[in-house]
A protein has these predicted regions:
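Acidic helix N-cap motif at the loop->helix transition within catalytic regions
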Residues: 120-122
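Conserved redox-active cysteine motifs that mediate thiol-disulfide chemistry
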Residues: 81-98
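Short pre-active-site segment immediately N-terminal to redox-active cysteine/selenocysteine motifs
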Residues: 75-77, 81-85, 117, 150
Length: 194
């Protein structure tokens, strides 16, 4: 068990360093924009398209708060899919917290979906705060919502509940936080205006 854990951790480190050395690629089609790490190895055909509804179900957060479909109507929603052992996921949390702080209001909702168990999430949050409303779901449920299994994954939904932006596997690297914040800020402003 220990050896397989060490091997998995080593593989994740290699994959992470490879991802950070690659540039991002943008797939654009009729004002639809999807950004992927070059290492993601996916095309836009795997992603729910711009204008589609994100199939979010009613949720219960790890703090026992209810997030219903009805409560999201008319709100701009940021959804992030992550997990505790995902280093790229963890690396982007400070940027996501900054975005949440800037746009926190009654007309916005920031949701983080993870397949980690509530106890593990709480232990993680004690060391590294994440200011989104966090819900734990089975991994298969999360992957079926976002239609791919890559992490981290973020989607911005406009007030009509339609996907206005998708980001998969941010590549990291020098000035990465600033670039990511600028990109997400621009895309969130667009969604607020829709």
């Amino acid at each position: 068990m220990k050896i397989s854990g060490i091997l998995l951790f080593s593989l994740l480190l290699v994959l992470e360093s490879t991802a950070q050395n690659k540039k991002q690629r943008v797939i654009a089609d009729n004002k639809k924009q999807y950004i992927f790490s070059d290492t993601a190895g996916i095309t836009a055909s795997y992603i729910a398209y711009h204008g589609d509804r994100f199939p979010l179900t009613d949720l219960i957060t790890i703090d026992s708060l209810s997030i219903s479909q009805a409560s999201l109507k008319g709100k701009t929603v940021f959804i992030n899919c992550w997990f505790v052992a995902c280093q790229p996921c963890i690396a982007e949390i400070p940027v996501l917290n900054e975005l949440e702080k800037k746009y926190r209001s009654d007309s916005t909702v920031f949701i983080a979906l993870t397949f980690d168990k509530a106890d593990r999430i709480r232990s993680f949050l004690a060391k590294k705060p994440f200011h989104f409303q966090i819900a734990s779901l089975p991994q298969a449920d999360i992957d079926s919502m976002k239609k791919i299994s890559f992490y981290p994954f973020s989607a911005i939904l406009n007030r009509q509940g339609q996907i206005s932006f998708v980001l998969v596997s941010w590549p990291g690297g020098k000035d990465s936080d600033t670039q990511l914040l600028t990109l997400l800020d621009q895309q969130f402003k667009k969604a607020l205006a829709q």
